[in-house]
């Protein structure tokens, strides 16, 4: 039986392990993000395929077993791995994706690298994904393609399956037209996205940026515009947009556009919070603090995440307000990049240098101002930190959405706490009750940390309660249901909940 739902995502849905000489799939250790929700749709479809890449040696490639069935799901669900050599992965993911596309998407054009990019390899791998996806798909299947790594897959799928439904979701920011058009491959990328039936983005601003790019490169016509949904802030912040283009015409095709940000999984997070082991960890953290106020700034090592600017602001805080020395602690869990991601080496060195400088200047025998962790924390440990934290300091220079901010709010369950959030994080237009700040302006950063530290408990609860209600209303399940409704998919997944 052919697949009615095909998901294209660069990661496999399960961890692949060897047990007793046999390859088996196990649930991923970290349950956060969109993978659990994608897997639920993958498992519920009548017949489905998940296409991802798998790094193999050149020798393994010759007799590689591409298809794996999932224990407990019978023959209904297939994970199809596209075998790539280490050299292909390096050029496709570590260099072309991260050194050429990533800086442009996040509006850091001075970080853009052209000479080392391998466009031919990128095209080839996208074609391999499309061919793997189409191999046993229904002619009118829904192909759900994820993110910029697979920009070219929609056009290749359309060529192979002209009647298919193709939905693309862009998980990163989509930059302004003058920034995006720096890419020398811009026409091919836009041509492929215009082969979709639906292009989804986190927020209205990214939709409008895409429309501006498409209109600058192709003879497209805007056929429908609407006022933005009440879930989005329409004006007054850096990424606000009052109106949204929801349909384009390109030749004889109509392309639907929409803004529907990825949500988190409140039920899962609350279940983790309720665990005895997590509650014990929260108590231990608070005991170790000894009455100090805890600030958490979680993320990963990346120049777009603003960790350097946040640490510089923290240093200024301790200088400006010496009475806070010994009274507050900053915990910075930022997972370092995988080996081979050379673009992030300087960012990590700078973060480590600044943390060391702050500790060298201000530390006492009884107090360490900054606790920096670059090894990944277990998800339950991170949630425990959020529960214990008085303030979450999430101030990226640019971020497509930022689920960490939402996870902090859910972990606090509408109780006391303060979220400091960059205006340049996509979720800022969903969470106006955060203390919004401009990480490019040191004075605004200083004002925001002062405001957070001074906020009274009643105000904290009011703000956190409103943010929690908004996040619960539009969780990750709603996000996925939204896409399926928009794509008019012939996939039986039960009645989506009402929004």
UniProtKB/Swiss-Prot annotation:
Q: Which UniProt keywords apply?
A: Cytoplasm, Glycosyltransferase, Transferase
- The domain of life is Bacteria
Q: Name one GO molecular function term.
A: glucosylglycerol-phosphate synthase activity
Report the leader peptide range.
Answer: none
This protein's pathway reads: Glycan metabolism; glucosylglycerol biosynthesis
Check the record and name the Gene3D superfamilies matching this protein: Glycogen Phosphorylase B
Q: Specify whether Lipoprotein is a keyword of the entry.
A: no
As its record notes, the protein acts as a catalyst of: ADP-alpha-D-glucose + sn-glycerol 3-phosphate = 2-O-(alpha-D-glucopyranosyl)-sn-glycerol 3-phosphate + ADP + H(+)
Per UniProt, the enzyme's principal EC class comes to: transferase
- Protein family: Belongs to the glycosyltransferase 20 family.
Question: Per its UniProt record, what PANTHER family does this chain match?
Answer: BCDNA.GH08860, TREHALOSE-6-PHOSPHATE SYNTHASE
Q: What does this protein do?
A: Involved in salt tolerance by producing GG-phosphate from ADP-glucose and glycerol-3-phosphate (G3P), an intermediate in the synthesis of the osmolyte glucosylglycerol (GG).
Q: Which NCBIfam families match?
A: gluc_glyc_Psyn
Record's protein name:
Glucosylglycerol-phosphate synthase
Give the organism the record lists: Synechocystis sp. (strain ATCC 27184 / PCC 6803 / Kazusa)
Provide the gene name from the record.
Answer: ggpS
């Amino acid at each position: 039986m052919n697949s009615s739902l095909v998901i294209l995502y660069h990661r496999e849905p399960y961890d692949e392990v060897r047990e007793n000489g046999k390859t088996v799939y196990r649930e991923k250790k970290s349950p956060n993000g969109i993978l659990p929700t994608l897997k639920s749709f993958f498992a519920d479809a009548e017949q489905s395929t998940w296409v991802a890449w798998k790094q193999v040696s050149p020798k393994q490639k010759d007799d590689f077993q591409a298809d794996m069935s999932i224990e407990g799901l019978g023959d209904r669900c297939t994970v199809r791995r596209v075998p790539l050599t280490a050299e292909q992965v390096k050029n496709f993911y570590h260099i072309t994706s991260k050194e050429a596309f990533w800086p442009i998407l996040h509006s850091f054009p001075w970080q853009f690298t052209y000479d080392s990019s391998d466009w031919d390899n990128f095209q080839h791998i996208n074609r391999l994904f499309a061919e793997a996806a189409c191999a046993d798909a229904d002619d009118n299947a829904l192909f759900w393609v994820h993110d910029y790594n697979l920009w070219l897959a929609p056009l290749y799928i359309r060529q192979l399956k002209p009647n298919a439904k193709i939905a693309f979701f862009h998980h990163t920011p989509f930059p302004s037209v003058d920034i995006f058009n720096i890419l020398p491959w811009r026409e091919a990328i836009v041509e492929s996205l215009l082969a979709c039936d639906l292009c989804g983005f986190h927020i209205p601003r990214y939709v409008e940026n895409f429309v501006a790019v498409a209109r600058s490169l192709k003879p497209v016509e805007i056929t429908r515009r609407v006022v933005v949904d009440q879930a989005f802030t329409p004006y007054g912040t850096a990424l606000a947009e009052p109106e949204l283009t929801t349909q384009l015409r390109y030749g004889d095709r109509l392309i639907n556009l929409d803004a529907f940000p990825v949500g988190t999984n409140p039920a899962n997070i609350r279940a983790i919070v309720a665990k005895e082991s997590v509650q014990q960890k929260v108590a231990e953290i608070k005991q170790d603090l000894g009455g100090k106020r805890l600030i958490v700034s979680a993320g990963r090592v990346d120049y777009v995440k603003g960790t350097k600017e946040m640490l510089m602001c923290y240093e200024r805080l301790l200088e400006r307000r010496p009475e806070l020395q010994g009274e507050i602690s900053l915990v910075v869990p930022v997972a370092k990049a995988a080996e081979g991601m050379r673009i992030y080496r300087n960012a990590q060195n700078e973060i480590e240098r600044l943390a060391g400088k702050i500790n060298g200047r201000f530390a006492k025998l009884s107090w360490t101002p900054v606790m920096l962790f670059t090894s990944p924390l277990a998800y339950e440990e991170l949630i425990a930190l959020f529960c214990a934290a008085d303030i979450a300091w999430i101030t990226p220079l640019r971020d497509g959405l930022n689920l960490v901010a939402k996870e902090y709010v859910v972990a606090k369950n509408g109780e006391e706490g303060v979220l400091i959030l960059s205006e340049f994080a996509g979720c800022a237009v969903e969470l106006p009750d955060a203390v919004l700040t401009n990480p490019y302006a040191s004075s605004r950063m200083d004002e925001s940390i002062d405001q957070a530290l001074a906020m009274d408990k009643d105000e904290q609860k009011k703000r956190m309660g409103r943010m929690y209600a908004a996040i619960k209303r539009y969780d990750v399940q709603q996000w996925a249901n939204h896409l399926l409704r928009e794509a008019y998919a012939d996939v039986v997944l039960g009645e989506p909940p009402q929004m």
